[in-house]
């Protein structure tokens, strides 16, 4: 039976870098909220134990693709604990709408959707905590997508506290460049000592992103996109970029601005949601 699963985008409504660990990873404080917009995974369970990605990504070997890695990781973990039914396999394809290197969490979201969906379809019975622990092996952002609730994140992004930020409308714009996360995190000018603050303090401050100035300085397309958006509404970088977003109180206000976007700027309008579309699909 063919099944379709949402793989939603996320926004970092704020992002502050509070330090750098001895292993090179940065510690941070960030606020994750999901969008009712993203990729869609189509999964058809198999009974012969085969795992096939029907929509490979050019230049990325299947075994390095996060979708395949997530499926194999679940297979291994469930098998190790005798919770993988014999013959469990799947054909997986993706309808990709989220840009790579956009700061919307596309790859992490894909991995989380695979973990959650295959755990359900195969009947493995792993708990949400177990799936989140597996997800952390694939990327720091994967656990928040597994848990599916808007969250305040600390540590390297894996210490999550559920929160309920206002569900606004967003115009998300992609300036046509891809920004690999390491480019931003390795920049010597990146702030690395923003003081840690409580959730309540941060939620009542003006939101900002410590990566934004670096992204604007190094990528003129990001600078141009933000300069344009800021004429209309409060706007920020999400994650390490390249996408930027502006917040609105209504869908119509966001669409009105999108309709005036310059030809070089791609964008979409979406609602911020505190319960992810993936989580809603399981209810």
Curated annotation (Swiss-Prot):
Binding-site list for ATP: 99-109
Any Gene Ontology biological process: isopentenyl diphosphate biosynthetic process, methylerythritol 4-phosphate pathway
Keyword Cell cycle: no
Tree of life domain: Bacteria
UniProtKB keywords: ATP-binding, Isoprene biosynthesis, Kinase, Nucleotide-binding, Transferase
Pathway entry: Isoprenoid biosynthesis; isopentenyl diphosphate biosynthesis via DXP pathway; isopentenyl diphosphate from 1-deoxy-D-xylulose 5-phosphate: step 3/6
This protein's name: 4-diphosphocytidyl-2-C-methyl-D-erythritol kinase
Organism, scientific name: Klebsiella pneumoniae subsp. pneumoniae (strain ATCC 700721 / MGH 78578)
Encoding gene per record: ispE
């Amino acid at each position: 039976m063919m099944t379709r699963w949402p793989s939603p985008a996320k926004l970092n409504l704020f992002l502050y870098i509070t330090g750098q660990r001895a292993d090179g990873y940065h510690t941070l404080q960030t606020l994750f909220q999901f969008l009712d917009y993203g990729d869609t995974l189509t999964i058809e369970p198999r009974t012969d134990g085969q795992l096939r990605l029907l929509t490979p990504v050019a230049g990325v070997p299947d075994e390095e693709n996060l979708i395949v890695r997530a499926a194999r990781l679940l297979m291994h973990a469930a098998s190790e604990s005798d919770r993988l039914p014999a013959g469990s396999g799947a054909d997986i394809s993706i309808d990709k709408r989220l840009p790579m290197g956009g700061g919307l969490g596309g790859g992490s979201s894909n991995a989380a959707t695979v973990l959650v969906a295959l755990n359900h379809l195969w009947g493995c019975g792993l708990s949400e905590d177990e799936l989140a622990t597996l997800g952390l092996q694939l990327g720091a952002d994967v656990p928040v997508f597994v848990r599916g609730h808007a969250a305040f994140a600390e540590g390297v992004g894996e210490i999550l506290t559920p929160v309920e930020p206002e569900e606004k409308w967003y115009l998300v714009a992609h300036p046509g460049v891809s920004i690999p996360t390491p480019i931003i995190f390795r920049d010597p000018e990146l702030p690395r000592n923003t003081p840690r603050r409580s959730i309540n303090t941060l939620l009542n401050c003006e939101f900002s992103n410590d990566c934004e100035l670096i992204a604007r300085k190094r990528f003129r397309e990001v600078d141009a996109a933000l300069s344009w958006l800021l004429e209309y509404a409060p706007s920020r970088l999400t994650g390490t970029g390249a996408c930027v977003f502006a917040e609105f109180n209504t869908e119509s206000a966001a669409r009105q601005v999108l309709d005036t976007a310059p030809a070089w700027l791609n964008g979409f309008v979406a609602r911020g949601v505190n319960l992810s579309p993936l989580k809603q699909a399981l209810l």
